[in-house]
Amino acid sequence: MIILTTITVTLLLSSATTAIGAPSSNEDELTIITEDFFPDSLIKYTGAYDIVQLVVPLNALNFAKDSDDSSPESDDGTGVIFFVEAELDDKGNKDYKGLYVLRNGKGTKLLENGRDAVAVNDDSKTVYLAASDGLYVYNYKENKADKYGTLTDNIIDIEKENSSNVLYIVTDKHEVYKVTDEGTKKTKVEKIKNAQQLVLDYSDNIYYYGEDKQPYVINAEGVKKFVGLPENPTSVTLIKPPFVMEDCVPFVSDDKVYYLNANGTSQLSEFQLKVKPTAYGMEAALIDYFAYKKHIYEVNLLAIIVGEIKDFVEVNFLKDKASSIQSIATRSRSGLHP
């Protein structure tokens, strides 16, 4: 349990306070991620298949209570997350098995054909859901998915601008479209070719990688390819960043983790992945989720700092970092609002 928390603390501190412009880690300072980093004591949920997508809403689902909303059961304060299950083959190809919401510790399948989700970063409880037959929106009161808009595309990835109501979707043909007018209009983003995955940072810079598994960023200056990263990697993943990260996203390339900056530069992190999570949910910064071997693990750094988890109180690493973590905790989610 201590080890997995160390991952989260180190990632937060290195990215939120020094990632932009920070030097690469020294090899002597590498943290090697092994199976020991995933203890049973942190398991939040166990699925029937691998969890390949985790989404932690930064809105009223997790940051506020709305007494006007009724729900099938009272919330227990454990947080609401969305996740996708899939059967993975040896090459990492996905046979999707459904999109779920985890609420009050109970997983509910919302869409059999669900692929991804993205939350609105405001005081609503809006979460958009991507499926093989178009878009849906989460109905909090009835804990179900409602059809949204008129699109019928087979969507494998979805993102939303922080500063507007614009959605971006990636189809099964690996084409990217900008979706507007409440899900009724789509415009192809011609500058993005063969997108396999797409992520936005909180300044709405777009990061994606193509068939060659090399990442790109689209900013005010146009499309930039990141240089100096490993060539011909076997597997790569873009991670939705914690909200404290500015103009930067984490990127996993085989067994290494990099920070990709919006200006087209990158830094190697201090992590080497001997084993890798199948999904990451780090948006909330201090309450993070990782998926590994069909389990969802929760790391609650806030609880650690206030001493609710006794085992951590005497750990020198956390005691040394406590003031920095508390500083991160004071950064308001409201800063995300346009």
Where do the PLM segments sit?
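A generic tandem-repeat structural signature
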Residues: 99-188
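Solenoidal tandem-repeat scaffolds enriched in leucines and small polar residues
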Residues: 148-253, 257-258
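A short beta-strand motif characteristic of beta-propeller blades
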Residues: 40-44, 104-112, 142-150, 182-190, ...
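Structural motif
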Residues: 89-101, 133-139, 173-180, 212-219, ...
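Repeated scaffold domains used in trafficking and secretory/extracellular systems
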Residues: 48-74, 111-124, 152-163, 192-203, ...
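Sequence/structural signature of beta-propeller modules
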Residues: 1-80, 86-95, 308-338
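Hydrophilic extracytoplasmic domains
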Residues: 252-338
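Short beta-strand elements that form the blades of beta-propeller/WD-repeat-like
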Residues: 76-92, 124-130, 165-170, 204-210, ...
